[in-house]
Amino acid sequence: MKKCKSFIAAATMSLAFTVSSAWAMPLPLGTDISDRFHGTVHRNDLIATDETYNLPQTNVISFEAGSYSGWHVHGAMTVIGIAGTGLYQERGKEAVLIRPGDVVNIPAGVPHFHGAAKDAPFQQFVIYDSTWKAPEGHAAHTGALTEEQYEEANENAAPSAMQNNDSEFLFGAGMTELTTPNFNSAVYLRKILGTPNAANSPEWVYVAFPAGTYNRWHSHKTGQVLIVTDGIGYHQIKGGALEVLHPGDVVFCPPN
C-alpha cells in the first residue's frame, strides 16, 4: 500500500480571539439546535465514527451565555472545554465549572446536564459513543432543568483546577517545548486528553506551530486526524493539493 506522507506548516498560529460578545468563539458554531435546549445552542459535527480511524463521534457544542440542556443520558462521553465558562452536573452530585482545557468524563447512562455559565458563553468538544442504547429497564431521571437548579449550579459549582492561560495559543497553558529534526524549529506540545477516558478515545495532543514552523514529510502507521483550533496552517499529502487550514477544519491522513 502506498504510504500517506504529509507535512504540516504554520503561516501564523497566533489567532487572537475573545469571548466578550455572545458568539465570539474560536471554532465555527455549526447548526442551530436550540429547540432541544434552554437558550441558544449550536452543534458542529467534526468526526463521524468509521472503520478506518475507529474514532468516537466528535462534535463541537456552543452555548450562548445562560443556555443549558435538560437532564439527559447518552453513551459514554468525554468533554473538553474550548472557550468561555461551562457547567456540568451529574444528578445528585455537586456541579463543576468547566474552563478551556478541562476534561470531564461522563459514564454511559448517567443523568446529567451541561451548559454555559449565566454570565459567559461556552464552547466544548464532545467525544462520545454514538452507538450506545440504554439497556432494557434502565431507569434514569430525564426532563427539564428548573431555573432554581440552574441558579444553584451557578452559585455553588466547584471551581476549575485549570491554570490561567496567558499564552497566545488556545490550549497554551502548560505547554512544553519540543525541538527535534522532524521540525525546522521548536514546536510546543500539551496533552489535553489522556487514556483511558470515558469515550474510549485515543489521546489528544495539542501541537502549537509558531509562525513559519513546519515539519518534514512523514507518515503514520495508524493514520492521523487533525482538528485545527488556532491561526492559519498548511497541510499536504505528498503529490496532492496544498490545503490551507483554518479553525474548525479537520484533516484525515489515512494509515500508511
Walk through the language-model features, giving the residues of each:
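Glycine- and acidic-residue-biased ligand/ion/polar-headgroup-sensing regions
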Residues: 74-92, 221-233, 238-239
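Bacterial N-terminal signal peptides
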Residues: 10-20
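A short hydrophobic beta-strand segment most commonly corresponding to one strand
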Residues: 119-137, 252
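Conserved short histidine dyad/triad with adjacent acidic residue
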Residues: 42, 57-74, 78, 203-220, ...
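Short acidic-glycine-tyrosine-enriched beta hairpin
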Residues: 92-109, 239-256
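Short beta-strand His + acidic residue motifs that chelate non-heme Fe in jelly-roll/DSBH
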Residues: 69-71, 88-89, 111-118, 215-217, ...
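Bacterial N-terminal signal peptides that target proteins for export
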Residues: 1-11
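A short, N-terminal "cap"/entry segment at the start of jelly-roll beta-barrel domains
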Residues: 22-57, 135-201
